[in-house]
Amino acid sequence: MKKNITNKILMVRPALFAFNEETAVNNYYQKRDNKTVEEIQNSALIEFDKMVEKLKNIGIDVKVIQDTKEPHTPDSIFPNNWFSTHYSNTVVLYPMFAENRRLERTDRIYDFFDNVDDLNVVDYSSLEKENIFLEGTGALVLDRKNKKAYCSLSQRADEKLLDIFCEDAGYKKIAFHSYQTINDERKAIYHTNVMMAMGENYAILCADSIDNLEERAAVINELEKDKKEIVYISEQQVESFLGNTIELVNNEGVNICVMSATAYSALTDEQKNIIEKYDVILPVDVHTIEKYGGGSARCMIAELFI
């Protein structure tokens, strides 16, 4: 049976990271201030390089693509949204909500695949023209071992394409709706991977964000069926990106839970103890990237299974 986790990942080193106006319309985690683009980029670059160094030092095989200034892709640091890889020597390309994020696609990812001779490319990106979006492992939290796709439906996660993905990949669909409170209003959470994360033996879940109690129970039931120990997190902890973690395995077979320093500081002792039963926690400081990009450690990592 295939594992849910990998040792090999791809990350994109930013050339001009910045607050993205096009994504801010439904990513309420993005914040802005009067810092210059240069200041933001310089801080993000330091955080990125330190994160790569920490990952390598703990035994993760990190492949890095250096982004270019042209075309300007302010969110290129989050490559997991536009492609995913799978054990069947398959790469899936996804349709993106923001027009400037569509420019992130690059054939340079193929340089890091072990076997490109019989690569199966599943390309859904043309569905952008029909305003149908499914933003990779931002929209999809995949349990690769049990072949389940958890998806919080939103402007960036279309159920029609979710159905197609699940049929093509042989996954069971677990679709639901999750929300956050913005100015006393319940607004859709833009990506599933900010409120949920999948490990081999545990799952992190903000159940409180799933307002529909039937949907909430269905998600919990699927996780319990697969004997996942659930780490329940609050909506406030989602704001600290505790849902945006990723489990990797190092070169010695030790499971590593990568999360931001912001997320780590939000952990309760009980939550920390559950995760540390199975994983070594690796906190990384990406506060600039979180603030202006509205994404955290998990968003920065594209897993390579081929």
Task: Label the predicted regions.
Residues 1-306:
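The feature marks the mature, well-folded catalytic cores of soluble enzymes
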